[in-house]
Amino acid sequence: MPEKMQVLGSRKGLTPAVQNYTMVNVSDNSGAKEAMIISVFGYRGALRRVPYANVGDLVMVSVRKGAPDVRKQKFKAVVIRQRMPFRRPDGTWISFDDNAVVIVNPDGTAKGTEIRGPVAREAAERWPKVASLATLIV
């Protein structure tokens, strides 16, 4: 990503996966274990419609469980896994065992130094600095 974090404009045809108030696992070693999504960046929907995010989207999370220095704080994060099946352009359907995010800094780099578990290819393509820490890209 360039200096400023960018979000996609069109969301047509995407499967609503994680939305506001969804509890997600934090898959890096930043100290957070579990977080709640509180907003989705770049979402332009109808009035009173709950915003949703997909793999690779930038969200704001509130850390609920983890180390005392990160609990009760808000961070930007990238969705790297979702349980809801989604379709890739080649026609394959993919889903993961959990909903997971990686906490990122304002410049788009991950706050932690390692990512546990697989990372979706869609997230790795949009966030190359996050992909460099991934052990497995699916």
From Swiss-Prot:
PROSITE patterns linked: RIBOSOMAL_L14
CDD domains, per database record: Ribosomal_uL14 (cd00337)
MF annotations from Gene Ontology: large ribosomal subunit rRNA binding; structural constituent of ribosome
Keywords: Ribonucleoprotein, Ribosomal protein, RNA-binding, rRNA-binding
GO CC list: cytosolic large ribosomal subunit
InterPro entries on file: Ribosomal_uL14 (IPR000218), Ribosomal_uL14_arc (IPR019971), Ribosomal_uL14_CS (IPR019972), Ribosomal_uL14_sf (IPR036853)
Gene Ontology process terms (BP): translation
PANTHER family with a match to the protein in the record: 50S/60S RIBOSOMAL PROTEIN L14/L23, LARGE RIBOSOMAL SUBUNIT PROTEIN UL14
Function: Binds to 23S rRNA. Forms part of two intersubunit bridges in the 70S ribosome.
HAMAP family in the record: Ribosomal_uL14
SUBUNIT field: Part of the 50S ribosomal subunit. Forms a cluster with proteins L3 and L24e, part of which may contact the 16S rRNA in 2 intersubunit bridges.
Similarity comment: Belongs to the universal ribosomal protein uL14 family.
Protein name, UniProt field: Large ribosomal subunit protein uL14
Gene: rpl14
